[in-house]
């Protein structure tokens, strides 16, 4: 079976993880690298690449529908909420660390960084959360693979950079940094999770379904439901995180929408029962909308649309 993947080091590491798990189940695979729009246009912010929605996913969907690959491997946080019905997410792998990590030039923690320190990130959510937590800091866009980002930090172009902890774990890199609390830095929905997609009703679907991790699927589904009515795609300042409690009777759920400047926030932070958790998550998602979350998300999209037009003018 052919596994389609992006060509970055991280994407290849994730695809190789899936290949290894399938081989343990007796399924032989090969990798096929697909270049996505998110990979091609690294000279502009991610939100300026086809509005950022599905920038790392769309081309893999297309080649799968054409029958050129059997399996696609994604960072689940990059996947749009609305998916083609013929391309189900057949397996959600066991989740890695879902939190953000701050790496600083000289090891200084976030609370001790000097005013006007420059923080690099490609995520509008992380940028907004930093502005809310430390409005005296400066955020700048940071694109490129993990190697490139770390090199720019070492060169002193940034005082700190924000990354997903899971990405470093999958690369096998142990770097000392500060894990940011989800109470202040609610992660992107499904962060730290690998999703595996196939065409429906195929041999690949049957094989891949054996890799599904039930608890991770439950948590990621709750996270998507919480923010499903907000719109905005995976690039707007939206966080969502669901954690199954040790007693397995409750989930701790957090979700928030921020303005791009971090000055406004609408959020929830509650415990909900596992039984009926899907319906309760829908209720909380509706509450986010009525509290003004949809308005904030729409305003962010409008601003991003204007910025994208300006950016595209520069690249014509």
UniProtKB/Swiss-Prot annotation:
S-(dipyrrolylmethanemethyl)cysteine PTM sites in chain numbering: 234
A biological process from GO: protoporphyrinogen IX biosynthetic process
Record pathway: Porphyrin-containing compound metabolism; protoporphyrin-IX biosynthesis; coproporphyrinogen-III from 5-aminolevulinate: step 2/4
Keyword Methyltransferase: no
This protein's UniProt keywords: Porphyrin biosynthesis, Transferase
Remarks, miscellaneous: The porphobilinogen subunits are added to the dipyrromethane group.
HAMAP family: Porphobil_deam
Function: Tetrapolymerization of the monopyrrole PBG into the hydroxymethylbilane pre-uroporphyrinogen in several discrete steps.
Family of this protein: Belongs to the HMBS family.
Protein name per UniProt: Probable porphobilinogen deaminase
Organism per entry: Methanosarcina barkeri (strain Fusaro / DSM 804)
Protein's gene: hemC
